[in-house]
């Protein structure tokens, strides 16, 4: 029994390590690098009123129907109506075990379980969810399921949210670090 646990632990460790060894590319999901504000990540409050929350991604603006591509290769974990404020969305598990989220899409052109290559079309830019009254855009966010504990006491973004929001910084990564610079 002890040998089984050692082998299982070793195998899981190798799988986890392999995910970190896969290189990550920097590609725009749509439009141009000048079509997003790289300082909008963790801007607070993003919604009206003090009960708002920090912005957990960057919004890349363009025309409705513009092609949206996967920033990285990976496995599509979710594709469809995300619900609530997010509207139509796609979630891709990419290198380093990071989840790449594409929300407010007009159409979703992939399906869960599919492997996508970098720059493969996954949908079109839109105004779904709570983006109906805003200019068309894709909300691009990056999450790590493995917490970055050292980020707990960091403040990022253009406004400093209350400290009780900082636990989210351990999981939400700045998408601008994954996109080409302007």
Task: State the predicted function of each range.
Residues 2-6, 11-88, 95, 118, ...:
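Surface-exposed, glycine-biased beta-strand/turn segments
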Residues 67, 112-113:
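A broadly tuned, weak detector of single residues within folded domains
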Residues 50-60, 92-96, 104, 142-153:
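Small beta-barrel nucleic-acid-binding modules, principally OB-folds
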Residues 75, 101-104:
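Residues located in well-ordered beta-strands
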């Amino acid at each position: 029994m002890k040998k089984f646990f050692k082998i299982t632990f070793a195998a899981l460790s190798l799988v986890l390590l392999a995910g970190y060894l896969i290189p990550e590319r920097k590609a725009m999901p749509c439009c141009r690098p000048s079509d997003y504000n790289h300082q909008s990540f963790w801007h607070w409050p993003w919604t009206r009123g003090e009960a708002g929350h920090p912005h957990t991604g960057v919004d890349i603006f363009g025309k409705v129907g513009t092609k949206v591509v996967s920033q990285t290769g990976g496995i599509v974990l979710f594709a469809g109506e995300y619900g609530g404020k997010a509207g139509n969305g796609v979630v891709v598990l990419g290198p380093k075990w990071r989840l790449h989220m594409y929300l407010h899409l007009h159409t979703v052109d992939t399906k869960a379980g599919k492997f996508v290559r970098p720059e493969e079309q996954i949908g079109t830019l839109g105004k779904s969810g709570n983006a109906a009254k805003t200019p068309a855009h894709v909300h691009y966010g990056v999450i790590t399921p493995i917490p970055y504990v050292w980020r707990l006491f960091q403040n990022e973004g253009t406004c400093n949210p209350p400290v009780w929001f900082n636990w989210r910084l351990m999981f939400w990564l700045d998408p601008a670090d994954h996109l080409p610079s302007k």
